[in-house]
Amino acid sequence: MRLIMEAKGITPILNVSNIQATFAWFEKLGWQKAWDWGSPPTFGSVCSNKCEIFLCQNAQGGRGISALKVTAGVDGAEAADKGVWMSIWVDDVDKIHKHCLTQGIEVTYPPTNEPWNVREMHIRHPDGHVFRISHGLEESV
């Protein structure tokens, strides 16, 4: 099979209702604001190591509208309660869980050893986006 598109990376774009509040939410998790654009800012990015997430206030993404394309109904309301799910791989889920509790971040699923050999937990962003935070478990002998 001939390779048509060789991807060099992928960056999700999350639709958010308040970009400044979202920067602050990610900073509670130890992510850094990488940049923002506009005056006032309506587009920006957060990063952790080599991972980056774009943030777009009330436009691009599965819950918003933009001048280019309506992505969810006339005003975005059809998907207002539906966020994006993303997996984030870390070294220690339990450490992240404790940190989230101290920061007031909503934990929707506590750290659990899953049958697919992964320990994971879920947190929810105020706009409904869910982050599945996981680390692999060692194979049992």
Name every feature range the model reports, one short phrase each.
Residues 130-133:
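Short glycine-/small-residue motifs
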Residues 22-26, 100, 128:
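Conserved active-site tyrosine of GNAT-family acetyltransferases
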Residues 2-13, 29-91, 95-124, 135-141:
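Vicinal oxygen chelate
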Residues 18-33:
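Amphipathic alpha-helical segments
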